[in-house]
Structures are given as structure tokens and as C-alpha cells.
């Protein structure tokens, strides 16, 4: 998902939804699926990190998690599927998926670098890049 206050899309979460998840001790994952990050132009890594900043300010760093929608190994039909669902792509005005600066797994270090530039601590980055998700799994799978 991503933040609906930043990108108006029915698949993005509202502030109330994020608060409800946090109130139960859960975590929301910020996706790299570009139509959820920005629609008027190809989103950048900074646009992606803006969703983290907003969510962290609203519900705290313990309730936000790294998430991706990778398309490795997809066929032409799989790639075309999002365009059959305009309610999901919300009038995306650019070609391709992914973020400028973070298009593949190989560019994951760019995410960490971007977080460091925003003065995220090592402890926060650890939580965001899997620590929160693992915490929730441990709590749920007792």
C-alpha cells in the first residue's frame, strides 16, 4: 500500500486505516508500485520515501514496513494486466513501473542511502526494512 493523503488511490490507505493497524500493533508496508506513489510523472525514490515520512509521523516507526511489488520474470500479459484495471493505476501518465532510483532489487542500497539522507537512524532503518514485520509475525505466530 501507500499513503492516500499523498496519492489518491482506492488501494492506498487512509489515515484512519493506518491508525487502526497501529492501534492493534500491526504494520503497514509501503509498496514500490509506482501508481500508488505518484500518478502525474514517474515517481522517484524521494517520492517513495515521502510516504514513509508521512506514515512514520502519523503512526510511528514501529508500524511502518518496507514492501515491494516486483515484476521479475513476468510475461507481456502480466505486465499489461495493470492497464486493464484503471481504478488501480488511477490515470498514470507515464510508461513503465518502478521508481527512478529504485527499479530493481540491485538498487536496494539506494533506499538505505535515501533513508540516511533523511536522518533515519540505523535502528529505524532496521525496523522499516524487516524488523517490524518480523515483530508482528512473532506476535501473531505464538
Where are these regions (language model features)?
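A conserved active-site cap/scaffold subdomain adjacent to cofactor or substrate pockets
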Residues: 22-45
